[in-house]
Regions:
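Rossmann-like NAD(P) dinucleotide-binding subdomain of oxidoreductase/dehydrogenase enzymes
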Residues: 1-120
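ALDH superfamily catalytic-core signature
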Residues: 70, 76, 84-210
Length: 210
């Protein structure tokens, strides 16, 4: 079961070793981004991979994902997505005692010490958070710095982020495009509001911005 934010990378990274080791595979891509998997299925067919070696099932996670996890003829589940989804997969897989491998949501720490190349590291860390329109679980979104250099770090981060081009993803200069869906956009807005309510300092951006 693969997520929407890296719809080719995640599929290939799971499928390639599976096929190479002689195992059959059943893929359920994210219902938000299924088209890449359809292309991969066509490629597998054109490559004359025997019928039944690669199987593609589209559908909603709580329906198809649960059926796959609980199915006694599936020996292992490989899941990449949210922690909530991972818990559901683990529970549904328990009765058949199948192996479960999971890569779930993260809040990656980025530790920058006083003797580091401070400006370069702050700037690079802030910019990495914008990759894939900020929709990556491995983005270093939790930056830990010496408290004595907080104001300096804020200024460097602000200067970096305010140079990021938001726009049409088809334009070469664009760094941040639209989020994957309206519901994801609203979730981000809600998280910004929650952060401010809990005492976070808004360095740049804010409500109404991705």
């Amino acid at each position: 079961i693969t997520p929407w934010n890296w719809p080719v990378n995640q599929v290939v990274s799971k499928l390639a070793p599976c096929v190479a080791s002689g195992c059959t595979a059943v893929l359920k891509p994210s219902e938000i981004a299924p088209l890449s998997s359809l292309v991969i299925a066509e490629i597998m067919d054109e490559a004359k991979v025997p019928a039944g070696v690669f199987n593609l099932i589209n559908g909603m996670g709580p329906v198809v994902g649960e059926a796959m996890s609980a199915h006694p003829d599936i020996d292992m589940m490989s899941f990449t997505d949210s922690t909530r989804g991972g818990v559901a997969v683990a529970k549904a897989s328990a009765d058949s005692v199948k192996r479960v491998s999971q890569e779930l949501g993260g809040k990656s720490a980025n530790i920058i010490l006083d003797d580091d190349a401070f400006e370069r590291s702050i700037s690079k860390g802030a910019h990495l958070c914008m990759n894939n329109t900020g929709q990556s679980c491995n983005a270093p979104t939790r930056m830990l710095i010496p408290s004595s250099r907080k104001s300096e770090a804020f200024q460097i981060a602000r200067n970096t982020v305010e140079q990021v081009v938001v726009g049409d993803p088809k334009e070469e200069s664009t760094v941040v495009g639209p989020l994957v869906s309206a519901s994801q956009y609203q979730k981000v807005q809600s998280l910004i509001e929650t952060g401010l309510e809990e005492g976070a300092t808004l360095v740049t951006g804010g409500a109404g911005k991705p």
